[in-house]
Amino acid sequence: SWNLRFITGTKKTRQKAGIILGTGKYIPKLIKIQITYKTESSTANIGQVINFVKLPFCELSLTGLIRFLPQKRILAFDFTYLKISVWGLTLYQGYIQNGVEREKLFAEKELKDQAFFKYFLIKDNFIAARGKGGGLALWTREK
């Protein structure tokens, strides 16, 4: 598992987000934004991703499929399932935006039609990537 520590957006994204994103944001340890990748040995390039945001009173998780292209260091992903909880009570849990169908077609989609990260730094305890839209994300390994 990896904890998100810093994010930026493209100039266009920053203009939309305004003061919230600015030129980039450090994510303090108080806010837990974690991403976990799971793969099976039989399908090493296809797997699952869980993106988890935890605040003192609420939790949000997005789950979906991933496809890793090792020669290009690209990880394509599609979040298809959402869970929202407040004070331990699940408010919503289910597929989003036709998620079941998108999961069936995920492996067949071209990279240009998917969201992805292109990793430019991969270390034992630190990873960094640019998103399809040009934003930057930095993660540290969960201890």
Task: Locate each region found by the language model.
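Soluble ligand-binding/transfer domains with enclosed cavities or grooves
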Residues: 1-143
